[in-house]
Regions:
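Metal-dependent amide/peptide-bond hydrolase catalytic core
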Residues: 1-6, 177-187
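N-terminal helical capping/dimerization or prosegment-like subdomains
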Residues: 1-78
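Conserved hydrophobic "DFG−1" position in protein kinase catalytic cores
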Residues: 55-57, 91, 180
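Active-site metal-coordination/substrate-binding segment of hydrolases
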Residues: 64-128
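Residue-level marker for buried hydrophobic side chains located in beta-strands
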Residues: 67-69, 157, 183
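Histidine-centered active-site/metal-ligand motif
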Residues: 72, 170, 186-187
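Acidic/histidine-rich catalytic neighborhood of metal-dependent amide-processing enzymes
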Residues: 108-175, 179
């Protein structure tokens, strides 16, 4: 379906488009549309629920194990301390800067490129690509809304900027809308 030489620049262009389209949690329709258009342009049959997009490898067989490739396309809102326009992707010294480039646009487009590379190949497992919404707020319309409709994951690759370190970092989530003064940050 795709060779690495073609997929890398296509993934970078998709990431630039995702960065250029604000996609705050619950407001991801534009980025969901971009992902859908990209995959359909590769003749991938997609499924969509709200702003969640998913696709199965073309040789999907329920008797084979299933590998999930999952990342999200929503972002937090930019803080006032940004030194660059967060919606204008810039490549500087080989790094692409912009809101969501690291968490988690870069991992997402990498997984999309991986999926496109392997989709037509005869694999001993199924691939399931999931581009989920509302991850930044653990929203009810994100991946949790899809779990009961998807096949069990025998293995999952989750695109998050963790430096490949496993950690228990959250036991729950409390969302409070408040106005706070000080230096902004995102963990």
């Amino acid at each position: 379906m795709g060779e690495t030489k073609e997929l890398f620049p296509e993934a970078v262009e998709l990431l630039k488009k995702l960065i250029s389209s604000p996609s705050f949690s619950k407001e991801e329709v534009k980025t969901a549309d971009l992902i859908q258009q990209f995959l359909e342009g590769k003749q991938v049959e997609i499924h969509r629920s709200g702003n969640n997009i998913w696709a199965f490898s073309s040789n999907y067989n329920p008797s084979l194990p299933t590998v999930w490739l999952n990342s999200h396309h929503d972002t937090v809102k930019p803080n006032l301390g940004y030194t660059k326009d967060p919606f204008s992707p810039i490549i500087d010294e080989g790094k692409l800067f912009g809101l969501g480039s690291n968490d988690a646009g870069g991992p997402l487009v990498s997984l999309i490129a991986t999926f496109c590379h392997f989709i037509g190949k005869d694999l001993p497992f199924n691939l399931l690509l999931i581009a989920s919404a509302e991850e930044e707020i653990s929203g009810p319309n994100g991946i949790a809304s899809l779990i009961s409709h998807l096949p069990k994951a025998d293995l999952a690759i989750v695109g998050e900027p963790t430096q490949m370190r496993l950690a228990v970092a959250e036991k729950g989530l409390l969302v409070i809308d408040a106005k706070v003064h000080g230096k902004a940050g995102h963990a």
